[in-house]
Amino acid sequence: MSRGSGAGYDRHITIFSPEGRLFQVEYAFKAVKAAGITSIGVRGKDSVCVVTQKKVPDKLLDQSSVSHLFPVTKYLGLLATGMTADSRSLVQQARNEAAEFRFQYGYEMPADILAKWIADKSQVYTQHAYMRPLGVVAMVLGIDEERGPLLYKCDPAGHFYGHKATSAGMKEQEAVNFLEKKMKENPAFTYDETVQTAISALQSVLQEDFKATEIEVGVVRADDPLFRSLRTEEIDEHLTAISERD
């Protein structure tokens, strides 16, 4: 692969190319897309929903052991898009950090603090020669006692932002375009509308109708702030509602 004046600058993570690029960080973003899945996050007025594809790479695998949705605490969920091994490593460290936070301060770690910690960690990985960036984009969701529903996205470069709706993975840009139209009027989605907007966004950009076993859906609600993954029957109900609406 020819990069002209960029050649040779992809061997060391800490060296900028003459154009001001860090190739290894750019490759980490490509690794996220190369995983071949697309994820969506949508924030409603009293809930947050994240949806991703559930692809089982091998017919002999136990389907229940394949997941991109992780509880960090009882109240915080994380949807990881990208390399599975990197995701699990990040989640394990995040759980340790959240437990340490609760022990030290006496209350649960808020979603924005967790997102900042993940972003800080990712940013440090872009500075040291003996590390590599994580090939993961993490969406963090939770209900804040003061600020209500929160949805954050953290990327391999160390950015983290709060979102009304967002996407990651293979069809990220197409999903963002779809969500921008849906969120144009700044709608105050109910819980059902939030879940169905996220699922229909995924169906629209991938141009396929999913079965309940082909996607994962994670939610938090203001009236029940515990993070949980929806059961297959619950996903089926939302898929039916979407097909009837369309």
Swiss-Prot record:
Functional note: The proteasome is a multicatalytic proteinase complex which is characterized by its ability to cleave peptides with Arg, Phe, Tyr, Leu, and Glu adjacent to the leaving group at neutral or slightly basic pH. The proteasome has an ATP-dependent proteolytic activity.
Record GO terms (molecular function): structural constituent of ribosome
Keyword check for Cytoplasm: yes
Highest rank taxon of the organism: Eukaryota
Coiled coil regions in record: none
Oligomeric form and interacting partners: Component of the 20S core complex of the 26S proteasome. The 26S proteasome is composed of a core protease (CP), known as the 20S proteasome, capped at one or both ends by the 19S regulatory particle (RP/PA700). The 20S proteasome core is composed of 28 subunits that are arranged in four stacked rings, resulting in a barrel-shaped structure. The two end rings are each formed by seven alpha subunits, and the two central rings are each formed by seven beta subunits. The catalytic chamber with the active sites is on the inside of the barrel.
The name this protein goes by in its record: Proteasome subunit alpha type-6-B
SUPFAM superfamilies in the cross-refs: N-terminal nucleophile aminohydrolases (Ntn hydrolases)
A GO cellular component entry from the record: proteasome core complex, alpha-subunit complex
CDD domains on file: proteasome_alpha_type_6
Organism lineage: Eukaryota, Viridiplantae, Streptophyta, Embryophyta, Tracheophyta
Keyword annotations: Cytoplasm, Nucleus, Proteasome
Annotated GO biological process: ubiquitin-dependent protein catabolic process
Organism of this sequence: Arabidopsis thaliana (Mouse-ear cress)
Keyword Lyase listed: no
InterPro entries: Ntn_hydrolases_N (IPR029055), Proteasome_alpha (IPR050115), Proteasome_alpha-type (IPR023332), Proteasome_asu_N (IPR000426), Proteasome_sua/b (IPR001353), Proteasome_subunit_alpha6 (IPR034642)
Any single Pfam family the record assigns to this protein: Proteasome_A_N
Gene name for this UniProt entry: PAA2
SMART domains listed in its UniProt record: Proteasome_A_N
Family: Belongs to the peptidase T1A family.
Primary residence: cytoplasm
Cellular compartments annotated: Cytoplasm; Nucleus
